[in-house]
Each structure stands twice: as structure tokens, then as C-alpha cells.
Amino acid sequence: MFYMTGQEYDVVVVGSGAAGMVAALTAAHQGLSTVVVEKAPHYGGSTARSGGGVWIPNNEILKRDGVKDTPDEARKYLHAIIGDVVPAEKIDTYLDRGPEMLSFVLKHSPLKLCWVPGYSDYYPETPGGKPTGRSVEPKPFDANKLGPDLKGLEPPYGKVPMNMVVMQQDYVRLNQLKRHPRGVLRSLKVGIRATWGKVSGKNLVGMGRALIAPLRIGLREAGVPVLLNTALTDLYVEDGRVLGIYVRDTTAGDDAEPRLIRARHGVILGSGGFEHNEQMRVKYQRAPITTEWTVGAVANTGDGIVAAEKLGAALELMEDAWWGPTVPLVGAPWFALSERNSPGSIIVNMSGKRFMNESMPYVEACHHMYGGQYGQGPGPGENIPAWLIFDQQYRDRYIFAGLQPGQRIPSKWLESGVIVKADTLVELAEKTGLPADQFTSTIERFNGFARSGVDEDFHRGESAYDRYYGDPTNKPNPNLGEIKHGPFYAAKMVPGDLGTKGGIRTDVRGRALRDDDSVIEGLYAAGNVSSPVMGHTYPGPGGTIGPAMTFGYLAALDIAATAAASRKG
């Protein structure tokens, strides 16, 4: 930790993910002295571990890349899927100010973005939804440009062999490697990119790390220090106003004395959710729940939420998360995307029955795993654990949990019981504890749907979102395939997440609010430490990062405006 006693800045930002970095970048360019403190030994948080997508309708990148959209369409879409869970003014503020924020970031950092063609909004058939997608993602970035700051960049989620850099738009094509010429061509493109990076001496990073690295350079050029291994312990208040934070050097042990960093004009919390806080998860979220199923950053233990609550901050949507059906593999959970959409697979509960469209958006899928409205109800979740069922043909054709098509399933996965293999469906039922008669009946009925191309029970394959990760060569439905080629497999599925959703209630300026909607002066929040503008839903790829960046930006602008007004006064 690069900490000196008696530090004072205009603005103190807690957390170095997208929310914190954009907030700090904005404050610095408003002429405010700014510091970022980060609890972890690396910067980037959950953003660096993510796909790096940014969902902001009508931004300059989408316009440049020829995406046809209007503010009215985007407004109609978001209001339809969010409903009245979130104030309309907050939704509209996000849509109105998000494009402005992104243009600012592109101007003041080396970040380069591009549209993700065809990566559909998650509810494209809803009025205003876009089957062609509204998501942008970072282009591969040479992390060597970070210089000495490279060692502090958050490691990637999953292994990246031989400097291979995969973008979101690559992943869907790579899943078609054995099925479509586009898969072969994309594989060649990714290989050429890796080779070019190696021979040219570049250290290419992709996805979330390609978003964070340019932001870090932007902060460096703006003169903003990032203090690693610096954990928030409490907020400092004078005369009812937040004017600083207490921090602890995490390398000095739990008994290290807290130190004060003063903030003349405000503190912005961008410290992430509480996905790695077992106590908070058990308190707020429905069973079964654990910190072992999340892929969020390990440092996210709700510190900002706890500190703000002490000052009377209202908390909202604490029961929810950015869920996704997850395979709890040995060592690290696997957040399943294409695995649920590829034909030749279904998900069943412990009764051997299907209970949802397996290909639906991942937050909603976990709501169905728990059961009830938005996953809420009495007692433990109704469909947990569930099992993803597939056959050898599926395994030979598609990527599964990072394994290439046809690649042998590691013995440790089988030995752990997370993946079960059997020669027959009846044997698979016995090994997984499923009722064989009901299970085989479910498979038989589903196979009929696969032959006809119509899922009469859950309409899988009817949405453009379903089809995005489907197999275009599989007829008559890209998401439905018979399960009949042994051996057969079952992969345990649990409600994992990218991070928790609930947090501090904020207004359109990012200010922290109490239960009566009064403002906690000097305190702001953005990202997963705050209650989401998206409510219980998820509009499209990048629907977490887009709001995090936007409300971090707006918080910094509000502090700058308040500071300017106080100087005039």
C-alpha cells in the first residue's frame, strides 16, 4: 500500500472496477484531486473478470458501426422489462446520459470498442428490443502499455493459453468449430491474432481486462493514484457529511490500525457487491446459497454496503444477484452460457422434469431454479440442484465448460460427482438420484420436440437470444437436439452469479439515500455496491457494466458541481 498519514484529496473513490475507475477519471478531468483505493492486490474487480461488454443504447460506437436504433425504442424496451421496480426518472437518466459518458471515456483513455454483431438483447421480442443487439465490447489491448502497472491487473477468469485472446463475438463462433465454416474461419482468426501478438511482442488481453487496462492508463495520465491492498473499514463523517474514509493495509494483517484519508468534497463507493460474504448472503438471499458458486472478485465482501448502512443508507434488492446457472467444478465454478443453448441438452430438477426454457437469459434462468417471482418464496429453492443432461454427440460437437469439442472430461470432475457419466439413461438416473421413469419420459418427450422443431412446453429456440448460442446447422430448431447417443452425461447445475445485485439506494445523481429518500451528504455509490437501475432483470450483454460506468460518471460530475458552487458561495 502506498499510503502516507494525513492524505487528503478532493474526491476519494473506493473500488477499481468500471464504476470506480470511470468515477475517478471523470473527477480528475473536472480538476479535482482524486485517489482510488482498492482492497485487493490487483485492480479491476469483477469488471476485469467479465466479458467486458457495455450495454448503452445509442452510443457513438453503435452509430459508427451502423446499428439502427432510437432513444424512444430503447426507452420503451427498458421500461417494459424493468417495470415499476425502479423509478422511471432513473431509467431515463441512464439512457440519456450513458452515451455522453461513453464518449467522455473514449476521449480520455486509449479504450477502443466495437459492436458485437447479432448478440441480441436478452428480451428481443419485447417492444423496443433489438435482435441484432446493442452491446459493444473492447478490442484486444496490448497490456504492455501498462508498464509497471501491468503486475497489478486482475488475472483473467479462466485460463488463457498461449496468449490466445478471445472476444465475446469470437466465443459464439468457436462453439461452431465442428459445425459451421464460420467456426473454422473464426478459429483461424483467433489463432492469427495470437501469433501476431506473440511475434510483435505484444501482451494482448481481451474482454474485461481489455476494458480495465485502458481505463488504468487513463487514470495514470490524469494523475490519479490507485492504492492497492487498501481496504475500506469505515466512513469518516464531520457535521453530518461524509468527508473521508478509514482504510487498513491488508498486507499488515487484520490488526493493522485504520488510517484516515480525507475527502474534501465527497466519497464515491464503487466497491462491488457482497458475493463473497457468507453471512450477508445467508441473511439476504434464499437458500441454498454459498460464496462458492460466484465468479465475482474475491475481495467483494460488501464492505461499502456495510459502511453506508451504518450511516442510515437504505438498501434495496439485496435478495437478488446477477445470477446464472453454474457448474460447480472442482477449483472454480463455470458460468454456463452456450452449454445451455446448444442442441442435445436439457436441464431437469431432482424430480426428473424440465422446469424452464434452458436457453433463456441467465438471471431469469436462476429465478426459475429458485422458483417463485424473481426467485423468491418460502423455504429453499425448488429446483436446486438441477442437472444439465447431454449425450456424446453433444460432447463431440460443442464446447463445454472450457473443454473443446470431443475433449475428454477430466477425471477429477467425474470423481467429484459434479459430472456424472453412464452408458444408459436409466443408469444415469440411478447415479444422479433421479426417478428413472419420469426422467426417461422427459427425455422421450423432449426428443419429440427436437424432431418437430417446436418446444411445446417452454418454447426454447423461439427467441433470437436463444438462437444466438444455438447451432445454425441443426434443423429444424437450432436449440433442440435429440439426446440419444450414449454415453450420457449429467452436469450438476447451481445458481451461481457474476456478483450480487442489491445495495445502496441512490438517486439519479448517484447520491446515497436513506429510507425516507433524504440524501447522505458527501456519499455516492455506483456499480454493484448500489441498487441496480435494471431492477430484477438484465437487458443485454453489458447490462451491469454500462450502468456502473454511467452512474460513476454522474456521481463525479455532481461532486464537481457541488464543489464549484461551494467555491462561489
UniProtKB/Swiss-Prot annotation:
Annotated residues for binding of FAD: 10-39
Following inactivation of the gene, the phenotype reported is: Cells show an accumulation of 4-androstene-3,17-dione (AD) in the cholesterol degradation process.
**What is any one GO biological process for this UniProt entry?**
lipid catabolic process
Specify where the region named Disordered lies, as residue ranges.
127-148
Q: Which domain of life is it from?
A: Bacteria
One GO molecular function term of this record is: steroid dehydrogenase activity, acting on the CH-CH group of donors
InterPro entries named among the record's database cross-references? FAD-dep_OxRdtase_2_FAD-bd (IPR003953), FAD-oxidoreductase_2 (IPR050315), FAD/NAD-bd_sf (IPR036188), Succ_DH/fumarate_Rdtase_cat_sf (IPR027477)
Which keywords does this Swiss-Prot/TrEMBL entry list? FAD, Flavoprotein, Lipid degradation, Lipid metabolism, Oxidoreductase, Steroid metabolism
Q: Which family does it belong to?
A: Belongs to the FAD-dependent oxidoreductase 2 family. 3-oxosteroid dehydrogenase subfamily.
Task of the protein: Is also involved in the formation of 1,4-androstadiene-3,17-dione (ADD) from 4-androstene-3,17-dione (AD) to.
**Record-given protein name:** 3-oxosteroid 1-dehydrogenase
Lineage of producing organism: Bacteria, Bacillati, Actinomycetota, Actinomycetes, Mycobacteriales
Q: What gene is this protein a product of?
A: ksdD
